[in-house]
Amino acid sequence: MPIITSLAAAVLASAFTGATAPATSSLPPVTITVSASAAVPPTLVKRVLEETDAVWRPAGFSFVWRRETDPVRARIDAGPCLAPGLRVTIGSGRAADAERRHENTMALGWIEFDDGQPDSEIYLSYDNAQAYMIDSRGIVGLVDRMPILEREFLLARVMGRALAHEIGHFLLASKVHTARGLMMARHTASEFFGYERSGFAIDAAQRQAVAARLRRSSAVAALHDVR
């Protein structure tokens, strides 16, 4: 039976802990296909992906975000990449798991596991992220009084960090949550919306596990012209 692993957001304040690890990997970028609902502003999608990049970059990993609407030329020019077949959907609706709440938490993103293996699709909920930001007014202030740009920056932080967590489940091929760092099951509003990313650090063991799994993969796509 499929198991849904989701990142729960807790509406609580906390101090930032942990340290960002130095980059150690020399692997090619990982290609991820992205699609977004028409209701999600393109500028927000761009910022979400930039935030996810910023979480993973200090650990030595990078991504090539391939949009379904990208021209073929752009895909060719991307260069050699690891292509594990991961797809991210940024949806404006509430999928079956999207409204799940437990002990003052809300699911922002999720990935399914079947027989211990991660599915190839991650769902990120735009609606839930907006609702969570409104619920976090004790941390971010009143959303309806914010300039649009400020609201988008805050949404990009929470959504980008949630996406980074779900990508972690995929790259680690594990449902396991940790006591600290990126793979914690729950993060507080202070961690999600704060400027610092220290609460989303990737530790040395996780870096090594992801690098080893990617190196074992034979799905290396040379996305350039063969001459």
Model region roles, listed by residue range:
Residues 1-2, 9, 74, 88, ...:
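Residue-level marker of intrinsically disordered, low-complexity segments enriched
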Residues 3-28:
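Bacterial Sec-dependent signal peptides at the C-terminal "C-region" and cleavage site
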Residues 6-8, 57, 173, 188:
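Residue-level marker of positions within ordered structural domains that often coincide
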Residues 12-15, 88, 106, 178:
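Generic detector of intrinsically disordered, low-complexity, polar/charged segments
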Residues 21-30, 66-84, 173-179:
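Generic structural signal for short, solvent-exposed loop/turn connectors between secondary structure elements
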Residues 23-24, 33-49, 113-158, 170-227:
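Metalloprotease/metallohydrolase-associated module, dominated by Zn2+-dependent proteases
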Residues 31, 60-64, 182:
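Residues at or immediately flanking beta-strands
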Residues 42-167:
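Metzincin-family zinc-dependent endopeptidase catalytic domain
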